Amino acid sequence: MVILYKALRYIVITIICLFLAFIGLLAYLFVTQANIEQVNYIEGCKSDETLTVYCDFQNPEDLAVLPDNRHILVSEFGAIIPLSPVNIQGNLSLLDTIDGSKRNLEIEMSENDWGDPKCERENTIFSPHGIDINQRVDGSYQLAIVNHMPTETIELFQLREINDTWSLRWRGCVDAPVHGYFNDVALKSNGSFYVSQMYDKNTSLFMLAVLDNTKEDTGYVYHWTRQNGFERLKNTDGAFPNGVELSEDESNLFINYAFGNKTSKYNLMSESIEATFSMNGIPDNITIDGDYLWVGAQDHSGLDSLIHCGVFANDVFEDPMTNQCPLPFAAYHLKQSDLSLVNSYKYSNTVMGTVTVALSVNGKLFFGTYHGDRIASVELSKE
């Protein structure tokens, strides 16, 4: 009995100590990472003196300009686990940059001749995340999307314009590896692609908060080909790989590490990191602009995102029905050659927040978000 009593006492003390350590860690994370002192919640969907907003979108997380240089293809994001308890259906739509109108894209199903023949799809229910458009060797335009529903896949489409109307023709899919959890994709002209593995899909919300603080490696980048499937790229491991983008000559891959707070230039020939740009915020998606890059970033910490835009938002928001997360954001204009900073644009307490992508089209910079109901734009000549 004495031995049993001591064992039980030891177990109870251990549990109490672990609980106190857990509370202490949460307090430490809050003090060291939560840095937004005041948040002005966004009411309605109206433009202001700086930003023009385009309403009625569902979490327009990633943007890509179409070949006509007029329309923007929008990935209307659903959700990712564990930031959401379950995956949520999203959509693919178009924004007309001339008249500001939105319309959905029609999708026609076809044979799987661009993806993995083993991958099957029976419907057009998607939960899109990162997207990319590129012209294939045969001249056709290909769209790739990271998709989270009903399973984790890369979905491949042919982008078609018929009678001045854009539509999509499904041309295949690729199933993710067993523990695959993707964020963004970058297409090559031969139909292969690069995709960022964020973290193991079984990672808990608490562990994500810890990893955001410790900056430990959580993922890497894959290269997929029809011949060899997924192959992990050497020297791409990092803290939450996020946006990826390929240079026009396909010799360099640009990678954002969200928890690592940096953008890196990866030489595909030497398989090494050649340059890095560091920031205080969270780099998300990357877009190409001639010899330059645009990096959309959240100008706050990961914990701020959880508090104001994540699972705790309903307890923090004055109005739980707030559609647009209001946290500060930034856009960084970088040289492709060495990732040196050309300029940065920072915004707070405006009609947009928590930006994930910055896309330059015809003198305007368009912003998307993973938690909001709008796209915004700014005239670059006025900045």
Listing of model-derived features with the role each one plays in the protein:
Residues 34-59, 114-117, 167-168, 339-347:
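A short helix->beta-strand "capping" segment at the edge of beta-propeller domains
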Residues 51-90, 353-357:
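Beta-strand-rich domains and repeat architectures in extracellular enzymes and scaffolds
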Residues 78-81, 85-137, 285:
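Blade-loop segments of beta-propeller domains
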Residues 57-67, 111-135, 170, 175-193, ...:
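Beta-rich, blade/repeat-based domains predominating
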Residues 22-49, 97, 164, 214-215, ...:
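Blade/loop signatures of beta-propeller domains
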Residues 74-89, 145-146, 195-216, 296-326, ...:
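Short, conserved, GDST-rich strand-edge loop motifs in beta-rich repeat architectures
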Residues 56, 66, 72-78, 142-149, ...:
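Conserved beta-strand positions in repeat-built beta-propeller and related beta-rich domains
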Residues 96-100, 159-163, 224-228, 267-271, ...:
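Short loop/turn segments that connect beta-strands within beta-propeller blades
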